[in-house]
Design a protein with these regions (language model features):
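Short linear functional motifs in flexible/disordered or boundary regions
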Residues: 67, 131, 150, 154-155, ...
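Conserved phosphate/anionic-ligand binding catalytic regions in large, soluble enzymes, centered on
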Residues: 63-83, 131-139, 270-285, 289-290, ...
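General small-molecule cofactor/ligand-binding pocket signal
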Residues: 129, 183-185, 412
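Conserved PLP-enzyme active-site core in the AAT-like
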Residues: 107, 138-312, 319-320, 395, ...
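A short, small-residue-rich loop immediately preceding and capping a beta-strand
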Residues: 126-132, 160-163
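Short glycine-centered, acidic/aromatic-flanked micro-motifs in structured strand/loop junctions
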Residues: 132, 187, 211-214, 386-388, ...
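Active-site-proximal cap/loop segments of hydrolase catalytic domains
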Residues: 338-340
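Non-catalytic terminal extensions of PLP-dependent enzymes
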Residues: 1-127, 144, 252, 302-325, ...
């Protein structure tokens, strides 16, 4: 294996090289106070081309959706159309400031207002906030809204949130952050919420249920309406984790199912870039009875249009708002990208997105089910979960995932959901063609063969990447962020 030891920018430095030429100042030169100056500031000295090549080289160590297939289950790593980027860079969007008077940013506000309306139409909810920064933040917002609703009715006994055992870890985390007790609800033999267990847990101390549908097994809950009714019958509300909305676009509206509040992951369903911790966006939609609790402000129409004037957009405060959850108005650049994506697709196109996402996942499932065990094996939605082990071979899901990197594929999500042993969670998304799906299926089939004949090839994988297998636990626990500092750096 070749382990590339990357030179740091300090090691590339050579005295006298420079990448910038400062223009002559247009103000009189002045002496800086001695106290502000340092004799020793070991900044690297490099030409522009050295810096560009350094970072370009580093960027190639990263896998990206622009570089290859990225079937990371639950994360919906679909291709991000470049027109989204063009629109987000339009100066009228990119160079406005959230503190500008509303009269000067009517276009931005019209975009936000229209996006709120479109998300309402797509999801079947009565009102939407665009503030939350990501899905998990949307969950926190939604749970705070649920609590505020109970409280407004004088119903203060409710302290429990019900969460299925297949849920994403953010669900218990965001409920826990608001001080609620988490009650785990098991799944039944077909991967649905276990109705008997749900009934047993429902009483007048329940705030609600956090439901992911389709769930993280990629399965549509066969009793979703009954699940929602059981929770409503005990006075609880149903939170919808909307991370899997990609499977439903134009087909099912969560609001129509009776879900009370839900977050959207714009960076998943609506193709805004994610990965690497970049900004996401997690708007929250609510049914009519929760609209007045939304975070403040939301974009509204201050003066209706008439024959001479377009409408005047501005900010309005919901009557019993839970308050602000984000500085300014959310991640506006993501809103522009989402607006563009929805406008480019239109209703028919969005429905096709869901249909092809589901078709692609079922195609892969059909190609792989003979090779890998699929514990809850029924028609899947936009993703499915297989077991990452091979009969008679000593390999784990992690070995299979790492070996896929040698075939130039991003590994699927592994070891989640927790209820599946050695989970490999595969989400191809709609943007991949049949050739790519076939190549991926063939790689996984070949790896299953290798697991039996040359298992050490898997144990030591990946072999082709700049770095081999890293100790992920150690990397997380003992994160070293400043290894680039020169040894003699004056701390
Ligand atoms: C991604 C995801 C979340 C969290 O969303 P973020 O935008 O990453 O915070 C929650 N639930 C499910 C099922 C997810 O896939």
């Amino acid at each position: 294996m070749t382990e590339v030891i990357e030179k740091t920018i300090f090691e590339l430095s050579s005295p006298g090289r420079t990448g910038v030429t400062f223009p002559d100042p247009d103000v009189p030169r002045a002496e800086l106070p001695e106290s502000l100056l340092r004799a020793d500031l070991p900044l690297p000295e490099l030409a522009e081309v050295d810096v560009v090549r350094h970072y370009m080289r580093l960027s190639k160590f990263n896998y990206s959706v622009d570089g290859g297939f990225y079937p990371l289950g639950s994360c919906t790593m679909k291709y991000n159309p470049k027109i989204n980027e063009d629109m987000a860079r339009l100066p009228g969007f990119a160079f406005t400031h959230p503190l500008q008077p509303v009269e000067t940013v009517q276009g931005n506000l019209a975009l936000m207002y229209t996006l709120q309306e479109w998300l309402k139409e797509i999801s079947g909810f009565a009102a939407v906030t665009l503030q939350p920064a990501a899905g998990a933040h949307g969950e926190l917002t939604g749970v705070l809204i649920m609590r505020a609703w109970h409280k407004s009715r004088g119903d203060v006994k409710r302290v429990k949130m019900l969460i299925p055992d297949s849920a994403h870890g953010t669900n218990p985390a965001s409920s826990g952050m608001t001080g609620l007790n988490i009650v785990q609800i098991p799944s039944d033999g077909r991967g649905n919420v276990d109705l008997a267990a749900l009934k047993a847990a429902c009483d007048d101390t329940v705030v609600g249920l956090m439901l992911t549908n389709p769930n993280t097994l990629g399965l549509f809950d066969e009793h979703v309406e009954e699940v929602i009714k059981i929770v409503h019958d005990c006075g609880g509300l149903v939170y919808g984790d909307g991370a899997n909305l990609n499977a439903l676009l134009g087909i099912v509206r969560p609001g129509d199912l009776g879900i009370d509040v839900m977050h959207f992951n714009l960076h998943k369903t609506f193709s805004t870039p994610h990965g690497g911790g970049g900004p996401g966006s997690g708007p929250v939609g609510v049914a009519a009875h929760l609209a007045e609790f939304l975070p403040s402000p939301i974009v509204g129409i201050l003066e209706e249009a008439d024959d001479e004037q377009p409408p005047l957009f501005g900010f309005i405060e919901p009557k019993r708002t839970i308050g602000r959850v984000k500085a300014f108005h959310g991640h506006f650049g993501m809103l522009v990208r989402t607006f563009t994506y929805i406008a480019m697709h239109g209703p028919e196109g969005l429905r096709q997105v869901a249909e092809y996402a589901v078709l692609n996942a079922n195609y892969l499932l059909a190609r792989l089910r003979g090779t890998y065990r699929v514990p809850y094996d029924r028609i899947c939605m936009h993703e499915f979960v297989a077991e990452g082990r091979v009969e008679g071979a000593d390999v784990h899901a992690l070995d299979i995932a790492k070996r896929l990197m040698d075939y130039d594929f991003h590994p699927p999500t592994n070891y989640f959901p927790l209820i599946i042993h050695e989970a490999l969670m595969i989400e191809p998304t709609e943007t991949e063609n049949k050739d790519t799906l076939d190549a991926f299926a063939e790689a996984l089939i070949k790896i299953a063969e290798e697991a039996k004949t040359t298992p050490d090839l898997l144990h030591a994988a990946p072999h082709k990447t700049p770095f081999g297998r890293v100790d992920e636990v150690k990397a997380a626990r003992e994160l070293v962020l400043c290894c680039w500092l020169p040894e003699n750096y004056n701390k």
